[in-house]
């Protein structure tokens, strides 16, 4: 009985020491990857006057809906997302400009098309 109590005390002491050591380990106070990226983006936006662009570009998007499984973007535009009828969530993008709905029965397909001009 005395040996068991001694082991129990030693085990508890060891667990307490390990817990205290974990508390003493330095923690990264810089933050998460998300906060670091956010900080860098803010820095770049704050300094954008240092690097003025001579070209002004606009980002425009439109949705193209077609019957069947395929919906294609107009020339010069790229697919950024797809939606399919009958609650089908299985689709892929072909050649960068066409949405292909993969479900067996399909009544419509929509392609979200964007361009930077």
Curated annotation (Swiss-Prot):
Keywords: Disulfide bond, Hormone, Secreted, Signal
Superkingdom, taxonomy of origin: Eukaryota
One GO molecular-function entry: hormone activity
Keyword Secreted: yes
Sections of the chain in a coiled coil: none
Gene Ontology biological process: myeloid dendritic cell chemotaxis
GO cellular-component term (any): extracellular space
CDD domains reported in the protein's UniProt record: RELM
Localization in the cell: Secreted
Induction entry: Up-regulated in colon and bone marrow in response to a high-fat diet. Also up-regulated in obese mice mutant for the leptin receptor LEPR (db/db genotype).
InterPro entries associated with the record: RELM, Resistin-like_sf
Gene3D superfamilies xref list: Resistin head domain (2.60.40.4230)
Tissue specificity remark: Expressed in colon, lung, spleen, pancreas, ileum and bone marrow (at protein level). In colon, found throughout the crypt and surface epithelium, including goblet cells (at protein level). Highest expression is observed in bone marrow, spleen and lung, with lower levels in other tissues. Detected at low levels in granulocytes, but not found in monocytes or lymphocytes. Has very weak expression in white adipose tissue.
Signal peptide extent: 1-29
Assembly mode: Homodimer. Heterodimer with RETNLB.
Protein family (similarity comment): Belongs to the resistin/FIZZ family.
Role noted for this protein: Probable hormone. Promotes chemotaxis in myeloid cells.
Name the UniProt record assigns to this protein: Resistin-like gamma
Lineage: Eukaryota, Metazoa, Chordata, Craniata, Vertebrata
């Amino acid at each position: 009985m005395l040996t068991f109590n001694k082991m129990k005390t030693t085990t508890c002491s060891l667990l307490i020491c390990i817990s205290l050591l974990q508390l003493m380990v330095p923690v990264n106070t810089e933050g998460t990857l998300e906060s670091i990226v956010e900080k860098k983006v803010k820095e770049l936006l704050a300094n954008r006057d240092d690097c003025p662009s001579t070209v002004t570009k606009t980002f425009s998007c439109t949705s193209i809906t077609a019957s069947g499984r395929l919906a294609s973007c107009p020339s010069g535009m790229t697919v950024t997302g797809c939606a399919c009828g009958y609650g089908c969530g299985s689709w892929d993008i072909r050649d960068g400009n066409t949405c292909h709905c993969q479900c067996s029965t399909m009544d419509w397909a929509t392609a979200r098309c964007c361009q930077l001009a």
